[in-house]
Amino acid sequence: MAALEAYMTPEALPGTESGRIGKLLGLKAKSPLDDIGLADHIARGLAVSAAETLSLALGRAAVVGPLIPEATLRRAKKGRKALSREMSERLYEVSRVVDAVSRLYHGDEAAISRFLNRPHKLLAGRTPMEMAQSNSAGAEAVINMLRRAESSFAV
């Protein structure tokens, strides 16, 4: 989770969600990444390196298997092809959750890991990571819960 240490000093992070997500995914951009640029990257399909970069932050077991089948990742890497739009969107959704949690916990890797991997009552006993990995609605449920926490509502 060393990649999350940047969240300890928020002034060092990109100022936009798109920029932070781009950083989590290791996206290279000539200018600061905005919403349109990020959407274009995802629509074209992210490079295999995006999955590898996110794996450095979360651990391989959180990305390879639950988000992208290992065989798919291996084929894309061997053929030097981009990931499919579906796989790219999965990486994006989990990155949104990781960004939100990392901002809330200011890069505290232990707290981030506990939050992501502990079952939560507001998620019907599922972990935030399971919800984020499931689909975009699951990721949105976690983000909404985090917004409540930021607004000082009990979660």
Each PLM stretch: what is its role?
Residues 1-155:
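Non-transmembrane "mature" sequence context
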